[in-house]
Amino acid sequence: MTDKKLYISDVTLRDGSHAIRHQYSVPQVRAIARALDAAGVDSIEVAHGDGLAGSSFNYGFGAHTDVEWIAAVAESVQRAAVATLLLPGIGTVHDLREAYAAGARVVRVATHCTEADTARQHIETARSMGMNVAGFLMMSHMIPPDRLAGQAKLMESYGAHCVYVVDSGGALTMDGVRARFRAFKDVLDPKTETGMHAHHNLSLGVANSIVAVEEGCDRIDASLAGMGAGAGNAPLEVFIAAAERMGWHHGCDLYQLMDAADDIVRPLQDRPVRVDRETLALGYAGVYSSFLRHAESAAGKYGLKTVDILVELGRRRMVGGQEDMIVDVALDLQRSGGAKSREAA
């Protein structure tokens, strides 16, 4: 780690949306954005939890449109860049243009870790619009580091300024993070930045982010009070405190972040964002973190244990976008009388 300035990317208003079933009100969005802007983060990501156009029967309907949320952030900040997320196959280039018109200037184009080729049109279009573009390789734990690096190289070739290791399942350990960033370094142009998006399902969100920085990572995703899918993301205030202890240049006011986490964000959680039996199962089984609330609903409806549904989803290697399979798995378990196996995938 050099004296370079870390790019701090807050995801409270996008990934954090999963934790409250995409029900942020516009006043809540404004309050969180103002607090983050005052605390010095570099960008604030905002959208439905599943990205632009994610509001749907499959993923859950949002309280507002993406454009309304993006405009609320853009109107509330003085210095932070407004970011958003797009998953090809859910969001379209049309949605991207609407987001830009509402104030978004950074976009993260997210694909499953083996499907970077689906991002080409969206990355190229975003670049042509003058946006800062990051490639986002979700479920990065599911393939070896060299294959992940090959996918990162594709995103770079389409024009991504930055490519992320995205631990959507919160299943990576520190060694796994280190190996992936070293593989990225072997193939990416030195001018291409790298980023880390951690989840806290094994309580390793901050540790994994620290390892990423030690391996040269430029951008760190985090959220206030860890607000995010599953056990949440790396808690922003905790990561900044650790970075401060390590003497890293982050540009954020720790005390303002601590206040925002406890006074604004934590009271919004209708289900505590924490490591517990269910969220630990996500990390243990390597399951997409946003499956949590859907699996809990299915467990309640069909008289099952959420953990059993999650572990079976991991055994079947289900990935983001296959939320409809949660009910299928629940019905299979109900017919078979419960858990098939609690061995991790």
UniProtKB/Swiss-Prot annotation:
Q: Indicate the residues that form the catalytic site.
A: 18
GO molecular function list: 2-isopropylmalate synthase activity; 4-hydroxy-2-oxovalerate aldolase activity; manganese ion binding
Q: Which UniProt keywords apply?
A: Aromatic hydrocarbons catabolism, Lyase, Manganese, Metal-binding, Plasmid
Query: What is the superkingdom listed in this entry's lineage?
Result: Bacteria
Q: Which InterPro entries match?
A: 2-IPM_HCS-like (IPR050073), 4OH_2_O-val_aldolase (IPR017629), Aldolase_TIM (IPR013785), DmpG_comm (IPR012425), DRE_TIM_HOA (IPR035685), PYR_CT (IPR000891)
The record's Gene Ontology biological-process terms are: catabolic process; L-leucine biosynthetic process
Q: Where does substrate bind?
A: 14-15, 168, 197, 288
Cite the binding residues for Mn(2+): 15, 197, 199
- Residues forming the Pyruvate carboxyltransferase domain are 6-258
Q: What is its EC number?
A: 4.1.3.39
Its catalytic activity? (S)-4-hydroxy-2-oxopentanoate = acetaldehyde + pyruvate
The protein's site described by Transition state stabilizer is found at 14
To which protein family does this belong? Belongs to the 4-hydroxy-2-oxovalerate aldolase family.
Protein name per the record: 4-hydroxy-2-oxovalerate aldolase 2
What species does this protein belong to? Answer: Cupriavidus metallidurans (strain ATCC 43123 / DSM 2839 / NBRC 102507 / CH34)
